[in-house]
Regions:
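Conserved, well-ordered alpha-helix/loop/beta-strand core segments that scaffold catalytic motifs
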Residues: 1-59
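Residue-identity detector for glutamine
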Residues: 6, 12, 17, 96, ...
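C-terminal regions of proteins
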Residues: 33-108, 121-130
Length: 131
């Protein structure tokens, strides 16, 4: 806990907002862990997002039957996409992060995503201009 306290202190002194989150995990997460993290986060004014909570699952559209690849420990592509889209919207809104998808300086990243989608998923990635 001492290392975590030091990490949080360094971030807060540097003006870096700390956020904790827990990905959906039916097998390795429980309410005792949730409460411990929530209490720690609350005591230090840190945001905590637990994607295992029913309200968060409803917001993301997450479904254990279609969005997990091994019965609840890891997300599949569909689950990762749902969580990533929700998290991206949250970070843009609550942390004022800029959307760089149309920024030419990030073109290489977009090309890498498109290549990944073609090779691994057999799909074509939609660019920010097309969405």
């Amino acid at each position: 806990m001492k290392s975590l306290d030091q990490f949080v202190e360094i971030c807060q002194e540097a003006g870096i907002q700390v956020m904790f989150m827990e990905m959906p995990s039916a097998n390795s997460w429980n309410m005792a862990r949730h409460r411990a993290v929530a209490d720690y986060a609350s005591s230090r004014n840190i945001s905590f997002i637990d994607f295992n909570m029913k309200d968060r699952m409803k917001e993301t559209g997450f479904d254990w039957m279609t969005d997990s690849r091994d019965g609840g420990n890891h997300l599949n592509y569909s689950g990762a996409k749902k969580i990533s889209v929700w998290l991206g919207d949250y970070l843009a809104k609550d942390y004022q992060l800029e959307d760089h998808r149309k920024d030419s300086r990030y073109q290489r990243w977009q090309q890498d995503v498109s290549a990944y989608d073609r090779i691994v998923l057999g799909t074509v990635h939609q660019t920010a201009d097309e969405s």
